[in-house]
């Protein structure tokens, strides 16, 4: 099974990706984790990405596509995966579809963890990620509305979007997702 996790900042994408990985025995491909590791290790791509991440901006599409392509060709993803933090725009979704077609790995579902903006802010402020400061959170929420809403429409039109209420306790959200897959 190949899943894309979608949602605003603080919606639980990383948490639910981990839970689903345990339940479904699939690797999690976390763009946030890949970016943080590349920045921490000062890889050439990480050095290019760092200023965008620090501002809370989305990385340019060619840079994101390069990150994801490098990861999807690794051998642990052959039987399926959970992709968290990518795509973030409709253009990236189309590019991902082309890449997956080339790799023979079609996407099964895009899971949207739905919460409101106030909950996004509250949850983000209670995390301990290096880029979770008020200015970056506000920027990311703005980018979510600008870019991710059209992405949801893209997957809805392809009839592979599952919207899940992400307000309940973590384990309950996991159960809601598993019941829908």
From Swiss-Prot:
Comment block on domains: Consists of three domains, a large central CORE domain and two small peripheral domains, NMPbind and LID, which undergo movements during catalysis. The LID domain closes over the site of phosphoryl transfer upon ATP binding. Assembling and dissambling the active center during each catalytic cycle provides an effective means to prevent ATP hydrolysis.
One GO CC term on file: cytoplasm
Catalysed transformations (reactions): AMP + ATP = 2 ADP
Protein source organism: Synechocystis sp. (strain ATCC 27184 / PCC 6803 / Kazusa)
Protein name in UniProt: Adenylate kinase 2
Class in the EC hierarchy, top level: transferase
Gene field: adk2
Physiological role: Catalyzes the reversible transfer of the terminal phosphate group between ATP and AMP. Plays an important role in cellular energy homeostasis and in adenine nucleotide metabolism.
Listed Pfam families: ADK
Species lineage: Bacteria, Bacillati, Cyanobacteriota, Cyanophyceae, Synechococcales
Residues reported to bind AMP: 36, 57-59, 85-88, 92, 140
Main location (coarse class): cytoplasm
